Design a protein with these regions (language model features):
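Alpha-to-beta junction loops
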Residues: 90-91, 108-116, 194-207, 217-218
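A structural signal for short loop-to-beta-strand junctions that line the ligand-binding cleft
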Residues: 43-44, 75-77, 125-134, 219-223, ...
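Bilobed "Venus flytrap"/periplasmic-binding protein-like clamshell domains
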Residues: 54, 58-62, 70-87, 118-120, ...
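Periplasmic-binding protein-like
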Residues: 58, 135-142, 205, 209-250, ...
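Short helix-initiation/N-cap motifs at beta->coil->alpha
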Residues: 93-105, 146, 163, 181-191, ...
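Extended ligand-binding regions for polar small-molecule ligands
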Residues: 26-36, 78-87, 158, 165, ...
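Extracytoplasmic small-molecule ligand-binding "clamshell" domains
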Residues: 28, 32-115
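Acidic, polar ligand-binding/catalytic clefts
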Residues: 93-153
Length: 282
């Protein structure tokens, strides 16, 4: 079962109790405290010898805290990757950053798994193998706090979408948005919103909430649409390690590690419960 809003809030409540950690120095990768046993679900032949290699697309605040690879030491997907590396038997993890177009277009090789808040779709399954899903996501609408859009006005508003995303497909095919402005990456789209070049941006609720937090509330998630989407990691088709990566993720879900990471990085970073964002009808 992927991480849901209910799991996030429950784990956040537990963390808020201030439960004491066991004595002794914790195992760490970056700023991530590792909870599993090293090598408990081993991967003998990773993409690069002696390390675990992860592909992503930056920036992605809260999921990867930092705009450049050398600055990222924590975040939801970073620490999730670190835990996977550890349980696979590695204390060295390399992160490769690429554009979203290259990431989702399967233009990069030489990695073990890629995490970039990627929705699992049938079309993408033709290109990649996906890991077990680890997060449930709906589609959010981000607008300027002083000029919000609503369920009706969004149909005629100037909408921004990111190329190659499920948000772009949803806006055009489900909402019937005509002539949206298309951006190559999230940062360009959100910059256009802040500059008033678009009225709203449509992308995953989790991503819009992170941007709301990053702007200090000058941008606001005014609504969301229920989609039933889930996030998964991308893997090169047919790699014999793919099943093992999914097994590690499932072990993290089962033992509560995923929920704790979600509470620490997502719930705390957003500063609000995603369930409080009203749902729009398409």
């Amino acid at each position: 079962m992927a991480l849901s809003k209910r799991h996030l809030l429950a784990a956040a409540a537990l963390l808020g109790l201030g439960l004491a950690a066991p004595a002794g120095a914790a195992d760490m990768i970056g700023n991530c405290e590792l909870s599993g046993q090293k090598g408990s679900i081993p991967i003998a032949n990773p993409a690069k010898a002696g390390q675990f290699t992860v592909l992503t697309s930056l920036p992605a605040p809260i999921w990867w805290n930092g705009d450049a690879v050398e600055n990222v030491k924590d975040g939801m997907e970073y620490c999730m990757s670190a835990e996977i590396a550890w349980r696979a038997g590695y204390d060295k993890m390399e992160v490769i950053n690429t554009s979203w177009e290259a990431f989702i277009g399967n233009q990069v090789s030489g990695y073990d798994v890629g995490f970039a808040q990627t929705s699992i779709t049938d079309e993408r399954k033709k290109v990649f193998d996906f890991t077990t899903s680890y997060f449930n996501s709906d589609m959010g609408v981000l607008a300027k706090a002083d000029a919000p859009v609503d369920e009706k006005s969004i149909k005629t508003a100037k909408i921004g979408i990111q190329q190659g995303t499920t948000g772009a497909t949803f806006a055009q095919e489900v909402l019937g948005i005509k002539d949206p402005q298309i951006f190559a990456d999230q940062s360009e789209m959100f910059a256009a919103l802040r500059a008033g070049q678009i009225d709203a941006a449509i992308t995953d609720t989790s991503i819009t909430l992170a941007e709301e937090a990053a702007t200090g509330g000058t941008s606001k998630v005014v609504g969301q649409y229920k989609t039933g989407e889930t996030y998964g990691g991308i893997m090169q088709k047919g790699n014999p390690n793919n099943e093992t990566v999914s097994k590690i993720i499932q072990s993290m879900i089962d033992d509560g590690t995923m929920a704790k990471l979600g509470a620490k990085y997502l719930a705390a970073g957003w500063g609000k419960d995603p369930a409080t964002v009203p749902y729009f009808n398409p």
